[in-house]
Curated annotation (Swiss-Prot):
Cofactor: Mg(2+)
Activity regulation summary: Allosterically activated by GTP.
Keywords annotated in UniProt: Allosteric enzyme, Glycosyltransferase, GTP-binding, Magnesium, Nucleotide-binding, Transferase
Annotated residues for binding of 5-phospho-alpha-D-ribose 1-diphosphate: 78, 103, 130-138, 199
Enzyme Commission code(s) on record: 2.4.2.9
GO biological process, one term: UMP salvage
Gene name as annotated: upp
GO molecular function: GTP binding; magnesium ion binding; uracil phosphoribosyltransferase activity
Enzymatic class: transferase
Keyword Nucleotide-binding: yes
Protein name, UniProt field: Uracil phosphoribosyltransferase
Length: 208
């Protein structure tokens, strides 16, 4: 599995600000979107382009445009919505597919409860966004859904990843690509990433 930890100074700076314990909901939300935007820039660096001729201000001019697979952005409810706006800054015409996953408190297994995928997802590259890759359960379940629907090109964008989640994702789906702002130390006894960001969903939605 291709794993890219984006080490750009802007990414590291913004992520550092997000780790502040008393950060406001407004600021956390803004930074989640901004880092999501920067991760998208990295994840789309290998998109193919083709030369086309358009009518410029002074006559015909040859330019490059993206060709090939179209894109669908796939936020995992609910926290993934916090990164979606930043992703769409770079791919504003992308279609949006939404997946909802919850964890069964008895079995601790991820359970899909909602999905609304674009009809031609088999023709699109999916950018799956979620702030945290902890155990990897929700992400694996989401990718299972996408593959069952015919999607074959999948990239994962997360703000912070734990080594445990990376290992689980690589075992389940070695063909996907992972882009993250940080690979953190690991999980604590409660399944939270350390040092992590805390509960990203609560911070984005102001329910902390």
């Amino acid at each position: 599995m291709k794993i890219v930890e984006v080490k750009h100074p802007l990414v590291k700076h913004k992520l550092g600000l997000m780790r502040e314990h008393d950060i406001s909901t407004k600021r956390f939300r803004e930074l989640a979107s901004e880092v999501g935007s920067l991760l998208t820039y990295e994840a789309t660096a290998d998109l193919e382009t083709e030369k086309v001729t358009i009518e410029g201000w002074n006559g015909p001019v040859e330019v490059e445009q993206i060709k090939g697979k179209k894109i669908t952005v796939v936020p995992i409810l609910r926290a993934g919505l916090g990164m979606m706006e930043g992703v769409l800054e770079h791919v504003p015409s992308a279609r949006i597919s939404v997946v909802g996953i919850y964890r069964n408190e008895e079995t601790l297994e991820p359970v899909p409860y909602f999905q609304k995928l674009v009809s031609n997802i088999d023709e699109r590259m999916a950018l799956v966004v979620d702030p945290m890759l902890a155990t990897g359960g929700s992400m694996i379940a989401t990718i299972d859904l996408l593959k069952n629907a015919g999607c074959t090109s999948i990239k994962v964008l997360v703000l912070v990843a734990a080594p445990e989640g990376i290992a689980a994702l690589e075992k389940a789906h070695p063909d996907v690509e992972l882009y993250t702002a940080s690979v953190d130390k690991g999980l604590n006894e409660h399944g939270y990433i350390i040092p992590g960001l805390g509960d990203a969903g609560d911070k984005i939605f102001g329910t902390k």
